[in-house]
Amino acid sequence: MKYIKTLLSLCCLCCGAAAAQTAAIAPTDPHIQYVGRICFQNPERPRFSYPGTQINVAFQGTTLRMKCKPGSGYFMAQIDDAEPFKVAFRGPRDSVVTLCTALPDARHTARLMYCIEGYEYKPEFWGFQTDGQLAEMDPLPAKKVEFIGNSITCGYGNEGRLGEPFRFETENHYYGYAQLTMRRLGAVASIVARSGIGAYRNYGAPKDGSPADNMPAQYEYTLYNDQTERWDFSRWQPDVVCINLGTNDLSTDNYDTALLKQGYKRLLAQVRKGNPKAKVVFLCGSMLGGKELDICKRILNEVTEEAHKAGDKLVYRFDFSPQTGDLGYGTDWHPSLRQHQRMADELTPFLRQLMKE
């Protein structure tokens, strides 16, 4: 009996030690660094919709696990300066993913970026688990940008191939032009983007537009298609706001150019109200061609010139080179990974100069 009691005591000690080895870190921990539009109405389960949402942390230890709502989708993860890799929360029970283990017991950093659109998955972050403790995270870059866009900005199908159906597994915003540009500039971006969305008319919508769910209808809220929380613009004041819309508005030859211009102007007014000191850049491309490309450029030039005449001199224009297929296509004729690299090659020097002015 004495032997059994001793054995049980040892087991309890071992179990206690094992439990102590992995500590649960709540999403409310002040060491966790967030980037993007995140809803903290339930601070223990923050929600987000848009690609590019970042969750960063530093820790002293050997192991780090991430906990999310099952079925939250895909993240790109980078531990220290190692090669980034994709992690998935796919199944109904996939709530914990090991990001790293058996590392040297030292300070490490983990950077997570949501790399798909969350309008179907409705992702939630539930915290971390570590055998050590959190440490102070590196500060965010000083240069801040906001990208407002459609599937091009999302990275729709950039890891896929022309002719195959779209799957979220082949969408990777991390390797899209926006994030490639940010890494080259040493800047950080918040993203408001959804495939199929327009400045006035979403893809395939009637000629009179999509007033309930186009970008002006969505821009002032934290989450996509969810009006429970208005976005607090004081949480993110970018130096530059890049707007890349128009491809869906001008789709299927069923558009109204006057309404498109109104949509751009309405969105510009919203952006300027929320970000009074930001430089705003209207981007065009890289999927449009022919007549629609000419229309998009003309309207954006008009909106920019009219803003200047009205006293807003901080509105700019930039055109990407139209894709030609020489770099291949992603799913549904969308930019390939190589096309996104070319777009970043073009946008990076423009934004670098703009941020110096």
Residues of each region from the PLM?
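N-terminal secretory targeting modules
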Residues: 3, 9, 18-148, 152-173
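Short acidic/His/Gly/Ser-rich catalytic and metal-binding motifs that mark active-site loops
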Residues: 154-158, 200-202, 250-252, 325-329
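Conserved SGNH/GDSL esterase-like catalytic core that processes O-acyl groups on lipids
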Residues: 52, 119, 163-262, 288-302, ...
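Short, conserved loop/helix-junction motifs that constitute active-site signature segments
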Residues: 140, 273-275
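Proline-centered flexible-loop/turn and helix-kink motifs
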Residues: 71, 276-277
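Extracellular serine-dependent O-acyl
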Residues: 279-284, 292-330, 339-357
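Structural recognition of the beta-strand scaffold that forms the well-ordered cores
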Residues: 144-148, 153, 189-193, 239-244, ...
